[in-house]
Regions:
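Repeated loop/turn-to-beta-strand initiation elements of outer-membrane beta-barrel proteins
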Residues: 55-59, 159-162, 227-231, 271-276
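Gram-negative outer-membrane beta-barrel transporters
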Residues: 64-244
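Outer-membrane beta-barrel architecture
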Residues: 36, 46-50, 62, 150-152, ...
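C-terminal beta-signal and adjacent terminal beta-strands/loops
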Residues: 58, 67-69, 172-175, 234-245, ...
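C-terminal beta-signal and terminal closure region of outer-membrane beta-barrel proteins
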Residues: 210, 254, 285-289
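Short, surface-exposed loop/helix-turn segments at secondary-structure junctions
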Residues: 244-253
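A short pocket-lining beta-strand/turn micro-motif at the edge of beta-sheets
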Residues: 226-228, 257-263, 268-274
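Outer-membrane beta-barrel signature, preferentially recognizing the C-terminal barrel domain
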Residues: 1-60, 132-147, 211-215
Length: 289
């Protein structure tokens, strides 16, 4: 999104099919070697227990927290155009000949149609985005907290040796505290200067957002008898929602959880091994995103 054009379209009530400004087109990102980056620093805290209630059975539980300062990442093209909009709003349409917005957003000169369209917007007219200089920067403090559960069971039978393993990861907190320009955007939105419909991406509560699912499960079972070994495994990733899309009724676009199963068969020789494997046995397709 070019949120300068988006804001103009919203306040003027423009027809979505008008072709003078395009706020939903793609934008090129240009990056160069980042300078003056600070090293990321993290503090890790964890507590765990280990239980062995039966011979061959081990159960583990670990709760952990990771706080990382000076997290390195991208401010984001959408956030850059939102900051460009904020500077334009603060300027109030004054002295447009000398107005300079966000220097990271490089635009074409506005043509006469765009200038005429901006006349009733209270903003200085700007042309379409050519590209956005979006270099890596130290963004914020990121905090992730969760719990890992592990169950391991090994036992022998007359039919062979069995090994079962389950690992579950449950994320309770994934938060990124804003800093710098992003903190300025948050304050502007809280004050009402920026419209609430403009999403500020990459900060705040990120759990369940854009691939940050809150749980993951892996299950692995192995049977071995003499030179033969068969292993089956499953991987389940939890659901999340895609912030850039909404359904027609305004609700979130949810991406459901996904489970895949794998199978391998191996035969062991004295100094070699033959192994046949099939990943995603059921040919499960990833959910639409």
């Amino acid at each position: 999104y070019d949120y300068v054009y988006y804001h103009v379209a919203e306040i003027l009530g423009l027809d979505p099919d008008e072709d003078v400004i395009d706020y939903y087109g793609s934008m090129q990102r240009v990056a160069s070697g980042a300078e003056n980056l600070k090293a990321e620093e993290s503090t890790n805290t964890s507590f765990g227990i280990v239980l062995e209630p039966l011979d061959g059975l081990t159960i583990t539980a670990d709760t952990w927290s990771i706080e990382k300062e000076n997290t390195i990442g991208l401010f984001g093209r959408a956030n850059h155009t939102t900051y460009d909009l904020l500077l334009n709003l603060l300027n109030g349409g004054n002295d447009c000949a000398n107005f300079v917005g966000n220097s990271a957003v490089v635009r074409e000169d506005p043509d006469q149609d765009v200038i005429d369209l901006f006349a009733g917007s209270g903003l200085c007219p700007v042309g379409p985005v050519r590209y956005v200089n979006d270099n890596y920067i130290n963004l914020a403090t990121r905090t992730i907290e969760g719990t890992d559960i592990g169950v391991y069971y090994n036992f022998e039978t007359s039919f062979g040796d069995f090994s079962l393993r389950y690992i579950g990861t449950y994320i309770d907190l994934f938060d990124q505290t804003p800093d710098g320009d992003y903190s300025t955007l948050v304050s502007a939105q809280q004050s009402g200067l920026l419209d609430q419909s403009i999403p500020l991406e990459g900060f705040g509560d990120l759990l369940g957002l854009d691939g940050n699912y809150d749980e993951k499960h892996t299950l692995r079972a192995t049977w071995r008898n003499g030179p033969w070994q068969v292993t089956t495994s499953s991987l389940t990733k939890g659901e999340f929602y895609q912030d850039s899309l909404t359904l027609s009724d305004g609700t979130r676009f949810e991406i459901p959880s996904m489970t895949t199963h794998n199978l391998t068969v191996a035969y062991y020789f004295d100094r070699a091994r033959v192994k046949l494997g099939i990943n995603n046995v059921e040919d499960e397709r990833a959910p639409l995103a």
